[in-house]
Amino acid sequence: MPHFNVADYQLSADYPPDKESFWNYPAEKDGWCAVHTALKGEIALLAEAFAALKSRDRGLVDWEIKCIQTAFACHFQHVSWHHHDEDDSFVPFMKQRVKYPDKLEADHPKIEAQCQKVKQAIEKLTEGDSLDELTVEWKKYGDMIGPHMDEEEATALLLLRAYFKPEDLKPVIEYIMQNGPKIEMGSCIYFMSVEIFRKEFMVQEKIPPFVWYIDFQFRLAEFKRRVIKNVEALKLGEEPSEGSRCIIS
């Protein structure tokens, strides 16, 4: 990707791109990147599950379909909320001070359309079906959203840090934290690891330690219950036990 000059996106002389020094952690540690890492992780896990299913060279059975539908429903909720965050919160907020890259906004409808194709393919699965169509659509989806998220981190995130101080973002971050689905935070914790989340990310974001005990640990448990247990069952080829059966939501 060519060198990205944040000054090229300045909207007004009243808001110069001079805020980077106020950020006391590198861009790759930002929560925006954490969400992207989690979404990529979910996409990779489901791809592994689909590959394991295809390797068995037989049609799907009922419990496998339920596991696929449950895990994907969580991913769909996560990615839909994330795009809502960006389109309705972050982007309008950033446009107060920067010329937000047009391509990033134009990408979302295309990605969402492909995700809808995946959703339709999953919803119509019946016993005996193969995963041929789904795996093709899933790869197309992953190949679209992955580079898009990388581009956001290489452009929009740099603009955010150049034109805004961390405290400027507090109202936006608080809204997202309070209103986002449990799955989103649970996924971020899972792919970041509990240790890094508690010892580094919570400290970085000035989140009091007690919040782990009253909130975050339950979000992680929800993600594991609804996504990880279903994906692991698919990979192992073992129907979930009563205590960890698929939960359709």
Regions inferred by a protein language model and the residue ranges of each:
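Small-residue-biased structural context
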Residues: 1-249
